[in-house]
C-alpha cells in the first residue's frame, strides 16, 4: 500500500502563495531536457532585470533623528571640546529621539531609484533510477547600490555613504554569485511500496506547517534573505536560504507518515542591510558596525567608526609625542567618545550542531480528507538579538586605555578600539536551543481550502528594549565610577558592573496560532480565474513582565523605563517625551490577497492583477519576531504579464500607512517596482 496524497489542499495553498506574493511568475515548461545514457536531466534558466523607485517624501518630523535635521551643520565637529549646539537647541527641533534608525531614510529621496538589479537563476536536475541530484544557483548585480549617488553624506566629514563597503554587506545586497540548493536524494519503495522512503542530503529547504503570509510559525527551519525578497522580481526560491541537513520521510501505514531532519549547518535570517531602503536599524546587519550605535545622550551628531578611529589616532599621537598633558585633560578626552557611541562587535554565531526536528503526519479521509501534522523542533535562533558589554570608567581602566593608545600611535584600527575598556559594545547574538511544539491541519470546505497551525515555543529569546541595554552599558557605568552618581538606577537592567557582558534578551514561552482560507472561484465576472486568500494570526507571550519591571523592544521606542523619580536626568540624557507604546503580551493581525487571471488577453499574453492588504490590528510583538505593530497597514497592487511561458513583466505599487505614533518605520517609504523576465 502507498500513502494517499491528497492534492487539492496542497495545490490550493501553493497557489495561494503564488497569488499572494506573485513570485513564481514563469513556469518550468520550457526547461531544457537532456539524457546522458540512463541519466535524465533538466536545466532551467531565468534572467531578470528590474528597478524600484521611492515615491513618498521622507517624514522629517517623525522618522528622522533630531540631530539629522537639515538646519544643523556638523562639519568640523569634534567631541574634544567643540560642542556646536546645545542640548536645548537640538531638543527644540522636530524629529525622532533616536538617530539609530534613519540612515536608509536619509539616503533616498522621493523619486530616487532604490534598486537597479540584474540577475540570473539556474536550476539543474539529474535523475538516475531512484536516485537524483538537484542544484540551484543565482548571481546578481545591483547598479544602484554599487554605483549610485545618495542625497545624504556623513554629517561630520561629508564622505558619501557606501552600502557595499563591508564585504559581507556587499555579498548580501550589492553583488554576488551564490549556490543555493545542492542536494542528492533517493526514493525507495520498501515492503513492495507499503512503506515509501525518501532521503535527501545537502543544502535544501524543508517546508513545514500551513502558514502562507504570516511568518514565525512552524516553518522556521530555513531562514529568509529579506534583501533578495524585497528586490524587484524576487522569487521565493531565491529568498529561502537552504541549509545543510539530512532529511527523510517514511510512510508507516496508508495514512500515517513520519518526517525528520538533522541540520549540520546554521544560517541566520539576512535582515535588510544598513543603507538599503528597507533597513530600519543603522547598526544591526552586515556593515552596521561602521555606523556605531549612537547613544545620543549629548549634543552630538551621528559619529561613525572611521571618524572615531581618526580622532583616536589624533589622541594617540598626542600621547606618543611626549608633550606634557595634564592627566585630568587626558581622562576627559578618553571619555569624550565612549559617552557618545557604543561600538559594534562581530556577530556571535551559535553552534552548527543540535538542530533537529520530527513531524508525524496523519491523513484522515473520514474527516473530509483532512491532513494533520504534529511537530517537534530544537533549533538555534535565526533571528538577530542584541547583547552588550558595559563600559569601564574606573581610573585604572581609563589610564590603561591611554597607555594602549600611546603604544599604538599610527596603528589605530577597529580591533584596537574594541579592546579599549572605556567603550561599551553591542553584539548581535543568536541564542541556542529553542524548542518548538506544533500542530497543523489542512482540509477543504467545498471549494475553499483551509489550513491552520499552532506553534508553541519554549524558551524563545525576546529582545530587551535597546535603550535599557544602552543605559546599563554607559550612563549607569558613569554612576558606578562616581562620575555621575545621579545616573544610578537609570536602566531597568540593574546590577550591571563595569565590563560586564549583558544578555540583551530574556527567554519566555510563546504561542502563535493562525488560520488560512484559500478559495478558487474559477471563471467568474469575465475572469478566467479568481483566487482569494485570507490569513489571520495572533501571538501570546506567556508571563511577560510588566512595563514597570522590564520593557521589551519594539519599533520607535527611544525612552527608558528606569527610575521614574529622575525626569530631569532622563531629559539630560536626551531622552524626551516620546510616547510610542511598548510590546504587549498579545498581538494579532490579518492578511488578504486577491489575484485575477485573464488568459490570452491579447496576442497570447496572459495578465494577472493582484492585491495584497495587511493590517496589524492590536498589540505589538517584541523583537525579533517582527510580526505585528498595532494599527500598521499596507497595500500592494500589482499587474503581471506573461507570454508563452518565456517572457514576463511585472509592475507593482506598495503603500505603507497607519500605526500608533511613529511606530511604523516604513510609513514614509512607499515605492513602485518594475521588472522583466526571460526564462528557458
Describe the function of each predicted region:
Residues 668-680:
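Outer-membrane beta-barrel "beta-signal"
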Residues 60-67, 150-157, 215-221, 275-283, ...:
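Flexible, surface-exposed loop regions and adjacent strand-edge segments
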Residues 127-286, 589, 618-619, 628-633, ...:
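Outer membrane beta-barrel
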Residues 43-45, 135, 199-201, 248, ...:
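Membrane-embedded beta-strand positions of outer-membrane beta-barrel proteins
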Residues 30-43, 55-58, 124-133, 146, ...:
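Short loop/turn motifs that connect adjacent beta-strands in outer-membrane beta-barrel proteins
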Residues 105-110, 166-171, 231-234, 276, ...:
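Extracellular loop and loop/strand-boundary signature of outer-membrane beta-barrel proteins
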Residues 49-55, 139-143, 203-207, 262-268, ...:
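Transmembrane beta-strands of outer-membrane beta-barrel pores
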Residues 113-115, 377-380, 384, 451, ...:
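Detector for outer-membrane/organellar transmembrane beta-barrel domains
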